């Protein structure tokens, strides 16, 4: 297949590769993949090596009528998830992730609305950025400061996105507000003597989730709001 028909993505450690074939033609029974890389030989030296991988398509000819009737709605839909966490929406916005890469996108039709305490609605502008590590994920970041007591609603109309399988999305709507719990606290870090670029992460006690992250290159005051009682790591 030509390069323009392939969608590829390496994982964060650059040792695994995902690829999708963007071609509506009938696929052959066996896909031959040739991978060129440097391999250690018997003398411990790195030498060029080509590995031939045969990927055989699953046999679908014997499917019964009953199995076809068991096809779920998500099997014929561009499946996506849209989420926004109250504690993180100021920095991370609304996150949209699709099960498969997109071949058609229409973010201009997505609507972001703010609703004030008087239930008055106003349209908001937002920017769209594709995640640098996951090409199936997009971040929709509201422009302007988010206000406590307001509700923010993101509405995605149907048939605005089409994935590599040719399926369109269903409509979706997500609402979020900034936390208002009086028991929440905030942490402020004053960093001095900074003369290089640093990434400062606040993690939970298990250190398996980044709650908020900053990239700094000079002395900075970093705010970590909406913290529940507990232990954290920086």
Regions found by a protein language model. Give the residues of each.
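N-terminal targeting or signal-anchor segments and their processing/structural boundaries
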Residues: 1-234
């Amino acid at each position: 297949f030509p390069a323009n028909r392939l969608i590829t993505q390496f994982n964060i450690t650059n040792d695994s590769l995902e690829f999708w074939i963007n071609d509506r033609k009938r696929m052959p029974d066996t896909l031959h993949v040739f991978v060129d890389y440097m391999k250690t030989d018997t003398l411990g030296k790195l030498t060029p090596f080509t590995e031939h991988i045969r990927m055989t398509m699953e046999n679908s000819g014997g499917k019964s009528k009953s199995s076809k009737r068991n096809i779920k709605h998500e099997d014929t839909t561009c499946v996506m998830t849209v989420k926004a966490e109250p504690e993180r929406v100021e920095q991370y916005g609304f996150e949209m992730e699709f099960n498969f890469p997109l071949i058609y996108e229409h973010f201009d039709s997505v609507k972001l609305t703010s609703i004030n305490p008087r239930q008055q609605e106003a349209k908001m502008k937002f920017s769209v950025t594709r995640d640098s590590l996951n090409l199936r994920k997009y971040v929709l970041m509201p422009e302007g400061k988010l206000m406590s007591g307001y509700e923010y609603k993101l509405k995605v109309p149907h048939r605005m996105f089409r994935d590599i399988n040719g399926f369109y999305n269903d409509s979706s709507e997500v609402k979020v507000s900034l936390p208002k719990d009086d028991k929440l606290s905030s942490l402020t870090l004053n960093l001095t003597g900074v003369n290089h670029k640093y990434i400062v992460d606040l993690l939970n006690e298990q250190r398996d989730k980044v709650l908020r992250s900053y990239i700094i290159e000079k002395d900075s005051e970093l705010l970590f709001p909406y913290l529940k009682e507990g232990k954290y790591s920086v």
